[in-house]
């Protein structure tokens, strides 16, 4: 049986693919207030603006290509049972060829009903304010907005709790729930932080 390697990935892993990180000066929030484009209230208040923001992000991500970091994780599958838990909403891990990817914050390539969270459909193009589910309810990006619960949190905790190795790549681990996931690893798990600007409070062997 292959050792279980759980990868916690964040925006930094996709930076070389041309996708800006959140906190960079030219990052994803540049020119936007979070409360205007990434909250349930914003969607209610100005659906057109929220959809336009995510339509632009979807187009940008579609143009990006997986980089060497994504491809290395695919190679790891030869020797490890690799389980990727990503904070990213693009599909670069999947396009690189990774088999098991869990998206904490949702996926840009999907849309879901504003009324029925289980009604999820592929979305490769732009969303419109006129998009409806079969019952006439408005569709929305399949994204976890600020203030919303993370539907896949329990499966993520379960994966980390079984890990032999945890790789933390491209994330500062400052955003919920990723900042607590690493603590779910078994006591004997090996934990490695791969980040050009590492969190000095993180011990790469024992965790926090």
From Swiss-Prot:
The keyword Transcription does not apply. Keywords: Cytoplasm, NAD, Transferase. Pfam families: SIR2 (PF02146). GO terms for molecular function: histone deacetylase activity, NAD-dependent; NAD+ binding; protein-malonyllysine demalonylase activity; protein-succinyllysine desuccinylase activity. Its main location: cytoplasm. GO terms for cellular component: cytoplasm. InterPro entries: DHS-like_NAD/FAD-binding_dom (IPR029035), NAD-dep_sirtuin_deacylases (IPR050134), Sirtuin (IPR003000), Sirtuin_cat_small_dom_sf (IPR026591), Sirtuin_class_III (IPR027546), Ssirtuin_cat_dom (IPR026590). It is found in: Cytoplasm. PROSITE patterns: SIRTUIN. Transmembrane segments: none annotated. It catalyses: N(6)-acetyl-L-lysyl-[protein] + NAD(+) + H2O = 2''-O-acetyl-ADP-D-ribose + nicotinamide + L-lysyl-[protein]; N(6)-succinyl-L-lysyl-[protein] + NAD(+) + H2O = 2''-O-succinyl-ADP-D-ribose + nicotinamide + L-lysyl-[protein]. Residues 1-208 form the Deacetylase sirtuin-type domain. NAD(+) binds at residues 10-29, 87-90, 170-172, 197-199. The active site is at residue 105. Its EC number is 2.3.1.286. Substrate binds at residues 54, 57. 2 residues (Tyr-54 and Arg-57) present in a large hydrophobic pocket are probably involved in substrate specificity. They are important for desuccinylation activity, but dispensable for deacetylation activity. HAMAP family: Sirtuin_ClassIII. Belongs to the sirtuin family. Class III subfamily. NAD-dependent lysine deacetylase and desuccinylase that specifically removes acetyl and succinyl groups on target proteins. Modulates the activities of several proteins which are inactive in their acylated form. PANTHER family: NAD-DEPENDENT PROTEIN DEACYLASE (PTHR11085:SF4), NAD-DEPENDENT PROTEIN DEACYLASE SIRTUIN-5, MITOCHONDRIAL-RELATED (PTHR11085). This is NAD-dependent protein deacylase.
């Amino acid at each position: 049986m292959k050792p279980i390697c759980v990868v916690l990935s964040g925006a930094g892993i996709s930076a070389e693919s041309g996708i800006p990180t959140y906190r960079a000066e030219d990052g994803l929030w540049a020119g936007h207030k979070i409360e205007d484009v990434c909250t349930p209230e914003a969607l209610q208040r100005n659906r057109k603006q929220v959809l336009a923001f995510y339509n632009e992000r979807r187009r940008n991500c579609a143009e990006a290509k997986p980089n060497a970091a994504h491809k290395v994780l695919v190679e790891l599958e030869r020797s490890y049972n690799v389980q990727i838990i990503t904070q990213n909403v693009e599909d670069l891990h999947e396009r690189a060829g990774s088999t098991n990817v869990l998206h904490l914050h949702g996926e840009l390539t999907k849309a879901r009903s504003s009324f029925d969270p289980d009604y999820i459909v592929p979305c490769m193009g732009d969303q419109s304010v006129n998009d409806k589910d079969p019952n006439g309810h408005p569709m929305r990006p399949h994204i976890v907005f600020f203030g919303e619960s993370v539907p896949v949190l329990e499966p993520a905790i379960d994966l980390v709790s079984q890990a032999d190795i945890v790789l933390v790549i491209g994330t500062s681990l400052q955003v919920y729930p990723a900042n607590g996931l690493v603590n779910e690893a078994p006591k004997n798990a090996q934990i490695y932080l791969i980040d050009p600007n590492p969190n000095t409070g993180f011990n790469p062997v024992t965790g926090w």
